[in-house]
Design a protein with these regions (language model features):
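A contiguous, surface-oriented mixed alpha/beta subdomain in the mid-to-C-terminal portion of proteins
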Residues: 136, 140-225
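Sequence/fold signature of self-assembling virion shell proteins
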Residues: 2-20, 24-29, 37-47, 195-305
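Helix N-cap / beta->alpha transition motif
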Residues: 85, 90-95, 184-190, 251, ...
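Terminal, non-catalytic protein-protein interaction segments that mediate quaternary/complex assembly
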Residues: 63-74, 125-135, 236, 240-243, ...
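A short, structural micro-pattern
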Residues: 81-83, 178, 214, 273
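N-terminal compositionally biased, intrinsically disordered segments and leader/signal-like regions
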Residues: 48-49, 58, 67, 133, ...
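Alpha-helical scaffold segments that mediate packing/assembly in large oligomeric complexes
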Residues: 91-168
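Assembly/oligomerization interface modules of large self-assembling protein complexes
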Residues: 14-87
Length: 305
């Protein structure tokens, strides 16, 4: 019979209920979530409708009409590679009282950061929010980096330069998309300093400039710096950032997020013969795909000395 020196034995359900999901995932904000079973297929394919907008010419309908105009539409096929990533944890029955739920919470947090890394950057198998290969998806726009911000310029001058970039982004959404609102995610130390270094009560702030430029509500969201560290990029086998600073504008209504498993503890049990409890934590692949024109618009930003 096994000996257990832990003062308080926790039932599995009780233990898992104590796990803290302390890292808020980015994916639910980015687009509509669609879960897949990893057992379904090696690759899940799906199609989107590419409407020829020039063919949308409605006919005037009257009793003598003999023909109604038809629209033209093609399809685009995209793929999602489903796979699981996992961690296991064992606790010996001979071990003194340990904070098992704390250990599992910390592990789930690490998996959550890596899930964000994949959501943002993508991998060799699946696309993320930031992709420089726009030719593979006609709904993903990569704007040319034709504006260089002087690193030594005043904050006002930098904001004025950013206004030109905002105008480009606004033009993309205005001419290609009917978004009701967009989120602009930004990254990079120099760009973050501009966003964070302003008093929101003045007219020269980023928010004030955005209100002047955008005709729809816009929110600015800093990409989690933790998820962009090389440690997590390497662990998640994610793609590299295309630039040190940049912005990616997203219309959540025009984006789908395919995934297999959100980071969480998924199973647990006890091996009485070997006298240990075991716990499994799992996460899985994720893909971010714009499904309408200008669903995602990327704009990198260059700072010169």
């Amino acid at each position: 019979m096994s000996t257990n020196f832990r003062g308080q034995e926790k039932e599995v359900k009780e233990l898992l209920a104590q796990v803290e999901f302390s890292y808020p995932l980015l994916a639910p904000r980015v687009g509509a979530m669609k879960q897949h079973d990893v057992k379904d297929a090696d690759k899940i394919s799906f199609t989107t409708i590419d409407l020829d907008k020039g063919s949308v010419t409605p006919s005037l309908m009257h009793p003598e009409m003999t023909e109604i105009n038809h629209i033209n539409a093609g399809t685009k096929t995209f793929g999602f590679r489903p796979y699981l990533l996992g961690l296991n944890y064992r606790v010996s029955h001979l071990q003194a009282e340990t904070d098992t739920s704390g250990v599992i919470s910390a592990a789930v947090r690490e998996l959550s950061v890596m899930f964000d890394t994949q959501t943002i950057l993508g991998t060799a198998l699946n696309k993320g929010m930031i992709s420089t290969k726009s030719a593979e998806n006609p709904f993903y726009d990569v704007l040319a980096e034709d504006t260089t911000l002087k690193a030594a310029a005043t904050t006002e001058a930098k904001i004025a330069a950013l206004k030109a970039l905002f105008l480009k982004i606004e033009d993309e959404f205005a001419t290609k998309n009917s978004a009701r609102s967009i989120d602009i995610y930004y990254w990079g130390d120099q760009l973050t300093a501009i966003f964070n270094g302003n008093n929101v009560a003045t007219d020269s702030t980023i928010l004030a400039v955005a209100r002047q430029v955008f005709t729809i509500p816009v929110s600015f969201v800093k990409l989690p710096k933790l998820a962009l560290q090389s440690k997590y990029i390497n662990a998640a086998k994610a793609n590299a950032l295309p630039a040190d600073n940049g912005m990616v504008a997203v219309d959540p209504a025009s984006v789908r997020v395919d995934y297999v498993q959100l980071p969480a503890p998924t199973a647990s049990g006890s091996n009485e013969e070997s006298e240990y409890d075991w716990y499994k934590m799992r996460t899985g692949s994720v893909s971010v795909l714009p499904i309408r024109d200008a669903g995602i618009v990327l704009q990198t930003v260059n700072f010169a000395g």
